[in-house]
């Protein structure tokens, strides 16, 4: 039996930890009385111990989250913040006990008014004082925008900025040391919101991680809407079943997988892939469940073509090959894309009965001319952000089934041209990484585990975690040359099958050997 003398250090450490926890809990429960900020109504302040599976009874059903596991002790502050006489955002701040002196804002997705609790849990668990808002409305529909321009303005830019202003004040009020640096982490609409901050509020963040950004958003809505006009409804002679999309995908891989030097089921650079479909067009008498008709082949060609406007101007680049299986159930399913239908019904035409099956590029012209509150988020002069010392890191999955990765390359080129700077100069403040085998923000067939979300987390090492890579860039001046991704054996949380270093654009990954394609050192950025 160990002596009491040997146990004393452990008992003392345990007592200190409990005392610290009690102090933090007491500080949290008394914090509500200290909050007196303009336009802020505190709904509640709760201490949440680490390990809690937090129930979320007030979260809108369409947001799809009823609970969230919280890994570290946090002080949870729920608020309503007025943004005008007729609008407000629902805002939460999660202030962790293991605070590292860093502030962070999360973003949103789609058209949704959903607080992303998984991002709050993820980043507060890493020691960030984190805020997240509902973008000014509740649920995933675009209907709240109908005849409510103030709500729309919250969605476009005001929600995140308001959350930042309030969140920074709360952070300084709660922690004596305040915060040393501020960060942003978001994907999809969250990626667009990150770039909106870069463009419109250059002093809000020191570092912005913006994934699969939905900028060029009005044209994105039109691009998503136009797929129905290509595929037609289920059963039409232009429609492809999921099985036919699988056949198409296999043929695309046969033609394009080996371009990067390795046949591993992953296309490292879809821009080099221009599928020729003649090999899978039906021969006379062949079973049409095993091949494509001429009209179906035309459908595929149209899907892999850019969208041009009524005057021939490029609106949106093509969908990248390699994403077709995942996109088939969402974008090519024989129904109008819901977000696009909502946008046109409730914002563009203010007509809930507008028929989304009748969409044409003439509608795209109407929508783009409106561009309410500059939703496009397509401004290419980000010199103010650069002058403020900010860093922006963007990534895009090359299997993205919702937002073409080609659009991120298009914006990168626009910034370089507008600011008249070459890639090596852009690298000083703006870096873009293409993530092969990553679908929309997460998932996919490749090494998508880059730590951009809780579900893609592998570890907190900056070499393996895109958020912590940004922290290292901002705080130590060490900019990431590659982003290492993990390929999981059986989805998120399973063992790591292999890792791959994803290249900084405009470089691309090429297999050189001599090791197997699962060896990250067998690949080179060229």
Swiss-Prot record:
InterPro entries linked: AB_hydrolase_fold (IPR029058), Tannase/feruloyl_esterase (IPR011118)
EC number: 3.1.1.73
Disulfide bond sites: 28-75, 63-114, 187-441, 256-273, 282-291, 503-525
Active site: 188, 400, 440
Pfam families assigned to the protein according to its UniProt record, in alphabetical order: Tannase (PF07519)
Subcellular location: Secreted
Keywords for the protein's UniProt record, in alphabetical order: Calcium, Carbohydrate metabolism, Disulfide bond, Glycoprotein, Hydrolase, Metal-binding, Polysaccharide degradation, Secreted, Serine esterase, Signal, Xylan degradation
GO molecular function: feruloyl esterase activity; metal ion binding
Segment forming the signal sequence: 1-19
Tree of life domain: Eukaryota
Main EC class the enzyme belongs to: hydrolase
Single GO BP term: xylan catabolic process
Record's GO cellular component terms: extracellular region
Catalysis: reaction(s): feruloyl-polysaccharide + H2O = ferulate + polysaccharide
Residues that carry a glycan: 53, 85, 98, 138, 246, 287, 311, 490, 516
Record bears the keyword Signal: yes
Residues binding Ca(2+): 257, 260, 262, 264, 266
Family designation: Belongs to the tannase family.
Known role: Involved in degradation of plant cell walls. Hydrolyzes the feruloyl-arabinose ester bond in arabinoxylans as well as the feruloyl-galactose and feruloyl-arabinose ester bonds in pectin.
Name of the protein in its database record: Probable feruloyl esterase B-1
Source organism per UniProt: Aspergillus flavus (strain ATCC 200026 / FGSC A1120 / IAM 13836 / NRRL 3357 / JCM 12722 / SRRC 167)
């Amino acid at each position: 039996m160990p002596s009491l003398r040997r146990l004393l250090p452990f008992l003392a450490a345990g007592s200190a930890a409990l005392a610290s926890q009690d102090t933090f809990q007491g500080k949290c429960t008394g914090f509500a009385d200290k909050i007196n900020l303009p336009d802020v109504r505190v709904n509640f302040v709760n201490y949440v111990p680490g390990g809690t599976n937090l129930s979320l009874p007030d979260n809108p059903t369409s947001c799809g989250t009823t609970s969230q596991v919280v890994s570290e002790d946090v002080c949870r502050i729920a608020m309503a913040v007025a943004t005008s006489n007729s609008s407000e955002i629902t805002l939460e701040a999660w202030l962790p006990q293991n605070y590292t002196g860093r502030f962070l804002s999360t973003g949103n997705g789609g058209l949704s008014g959903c607080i992303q609790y998984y991002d709050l849990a993820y980043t507060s668990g890493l020691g960030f004082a984190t805020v997240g808002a509902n973008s000014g409305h509740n649920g995933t529909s675009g209907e709240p925008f109908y005849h409510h321009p103030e709500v729309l303005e919250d969605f476009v830019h005001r929600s995140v900025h308001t959350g930042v202003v309030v969140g920074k004040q709360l952070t300084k009020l709660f922690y004596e040391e305040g915060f040393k640096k501020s960060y942003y982490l978001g994907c999809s609409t969250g990626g667009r919101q990150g770039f909106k901050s870069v463009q419109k509020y250059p002093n809000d963040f020191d570092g912005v991680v913006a994934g699969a950004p939905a900028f060029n958003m009005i044209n994105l809505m039109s691009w998503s809407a136009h797929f129905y006009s290509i595929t037609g409804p289920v059963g039409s002679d232009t429609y492809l079943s999921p099985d036919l999309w699988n056949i198409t995908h296999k043929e695309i891989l046969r033609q394009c997988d080996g371009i990067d030097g390795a046949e591993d089921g992953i296309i490292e650079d879809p821009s080099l892939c221009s599928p020729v479909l003649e090999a899978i067009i039906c021969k006379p008498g062949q079973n049409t469940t095993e091949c494509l008709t001429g009209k179906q082949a035309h459908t595929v060609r149209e899907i892999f073509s850019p969208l041009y406007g009524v005057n021939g101007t490029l609106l949106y680049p093509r969908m990248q090959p390699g994403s077709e299986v995942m996109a088939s159930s969402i974008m090519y399913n024989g129904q109008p894309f819901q977000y696009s239908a909502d946008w046109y019904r409730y914002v563009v035409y203010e007509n809930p009965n507008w028929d989304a099956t009748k969409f044409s590029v003439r509608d795209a012209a109407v929508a783009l001319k409106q561009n309410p509150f500059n939703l496009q988020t397509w401004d290419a002069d980000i010199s103010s952000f650069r002058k403020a010392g900010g860093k922006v890191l963007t990534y895009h999955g090359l299997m993205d089934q919702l937002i073409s990765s080609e659009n991120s390359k298009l914006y990168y080129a626009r910034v370089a041209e507008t600011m008249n700077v070459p890639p090596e100069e852009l690298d000083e403040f703006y870096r873009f990484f293409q993530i092969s085998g990553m679908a929309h923000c997460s998932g996919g067939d490749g090494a998508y585990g880059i730590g951009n979300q809780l579900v893609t987390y592998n570890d907190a090492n900056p070499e393996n975690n895109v958020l912590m890579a940004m922290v290292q860039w901002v705080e130590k001046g060490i900019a990431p040359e590659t982003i290492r991704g993990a390929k999981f054996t059986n989805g998120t949380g399973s063992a790591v099958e292999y890792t791959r270093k994803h290249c900084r654009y405009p470089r691309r990954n090429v297999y050189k050997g001599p090791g197997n394609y699962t060896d990250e050192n067998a690949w080179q950025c060229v």
